[in-house]
Amino acid sequence: ARLFKQFSRAVGDRNAEKMEKALQEILVGGSYLNLVDENSYILVVMTLLRGLISDYDVRTEVEQGNGRTDLFLRPLSSNKVPMILEFKKVDSEKDLVPATEEAIRQIRDKRYALGMPSDTVLIGMAFWGKVPKVLIGNANR
């Protein structure tokens, strides 16, 4: 439970390093054979967030702009901002950073934040096996 709380706190604080650290510790506990595609990682993160963040409605595959977000955190109160998460699975460690950049670019190019506040948080996550990488941006670039 400690790691789950650390992860959800890191998401709320928009702290990419702490998100990566908690996620890696969580992923180390399972077999990489279970992490077969992007959906595997989406399910892990959704489960972590859904059970721990009471200020948000956590949804997958929400139609936004010109596509569907991998994960969307809709705030339940006006003092919170929406968060859009896009996931990428890569085949090598060197592809982690470019994949997080591509995830943020996809959110912008497909206009997933259309009609949302300019401070909407964009989170690009890439995974190489049990190694996560996180990049955080916002809708107003």
Please annotate each region the language model reported.
Residues 1-105, 109-113, 126, 132-141:
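Extended alpha-helical interface modules used as scaffolds for assembling large macromolecular complexes
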Residues 80-82, 118-121:
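Short glycine-/polar-rich loops that comprise or flank the Walker A/P-loop
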